[in-house]
């Protein structure tokens, strides 16, 4: 059911990335998403970073309009929807790239792990979008940047390959090319990734978010490595009108 909620707080997290705290607290599993509607603009899926927290990157008309809103303004939401992370594993790697941090942050906060390490990658220092309190929820934070302007020069997958033996389970969200490499490193075992496809209805009716035999909104957005074997994941996605789009 569509509900009107107010924006209680908004702040800049990184370059072109904002956080929005909403008035309604939701019961959710880390990895689930909501559909957020701006009247006269569009409706889009957004992963939850917390019970009433979303993080958004400015990339088009919808996000441009969302960025104009301030505290006290209203948006409309429905959900949460989809399947979240399982929470399996004792010593885990939580991997996020760019704006893939919201569901990973939620898992870090609410997961029950003996040991967890966050591996986060951004293109530059300016684009690091980590919540300030992330270190409270994990045992170690490792940051990589493509250009070496902060942390380790390279990618989260480089760190995973180097420290693979430390983890019995891996969770990840971010660019699909990165996720595909993580699946390869893990040989599709003991790994879950949050997939992204163009999504319209959010409830498994329209079929626009098809991924092999699955619908991302209904069967995902979180999938196990085994589920993604022999699918197009990591090879191509589709445009809103269904055409194949190379990654």
Swiss-Prot record:
The keyword Membrane belongs to this UniProt entry's keyword annotation: no
SUPFAM superfamilies from the UniProt entry: Ferredoxin reductase-like, C-terminal NADP-linked domain (SSF52343), Riboflavin synthase domain-like (SSF63380)
Annotated GO MF terms: 2 iron, 2 sulfur cluster binding; electron transfer activity; flavin adenine dinucleotide binding; metal ion binding; oxidoreductase activity
Matches recorded under Pfam families: DHODB_Fe-S_bind, NAD_binding_1
InterPro entries: Cyt_c3_hydrogenase_gsu (IPR012165), Dihydroorotate_DH_ele_sf (IPR037117), Dihydroorotate_DH_Fe-S-bd (IPR019480), Dihydroorotate_DHASE_ETsu (IPR023455), FAD-bd_FR_type (IPR017927), FNR_nucleotide-bd (IPR039261), OxRdtase_FAD/NAD-bd (IPR001433), PyrK_electron_transfer (IPR050353)
Keywords tagged on the record: 2Fe-2S, Electron transport, FAD, Flavoprotein, Iron, Iron-sulfur, Metal-binding, Pyrimidine biosynthesis, Transport
GO biological process: 'de novo' UMP biosynthetic process
UniProt keyword Lipid biosynthesis, yes or no: no
Cofactors required: [2Fe-2S] cluster; FAD
UniProt: [2Fe-2S] cluster binding residues: 201, 206, 209, 217
Cofactor remark from the record: Binds 1 [2Fe-2S] cluster per subunit.
Pathway(s) per entry: Pyrimidine metabolism; UMP biosynthesis via de novo pathway; orotate from (S)-dihydroorotate (NAD(+) route): step 1/1
Residue ranges of every copy of the FAD-binding FR-type domain listed in the record: 1-87
Gene3D superfamilies named among the record's database cross-references: Dihydroorotate dehydrogenase, electron transfer subunit, Nucleotide-binding domain of ferredoxin-NADP reductase (FNR) module, Translation factors
NCBIfam families: PRK00054.1-1
Subunit note: Heterotetramer of 2 PyrK and 2 PyrD type B subunits.
Family to which this protein belongs: Belongs to the PyrK family.
HAMAP family, sorted: DHODB_Fe_S_bind
Protein's UniProt name: Probable dihydroorotate dehydrogenase B (NAD(+)), electron transfer subunit
Species of origin: Pyrococcus furiosus (strain ATCC 43587 / DSM 3638 / JCM 8422 / Vc1)
Species lineage: Archaea, Methanobacteriati, Methanobacteriota, Thermococci, Thermococcales
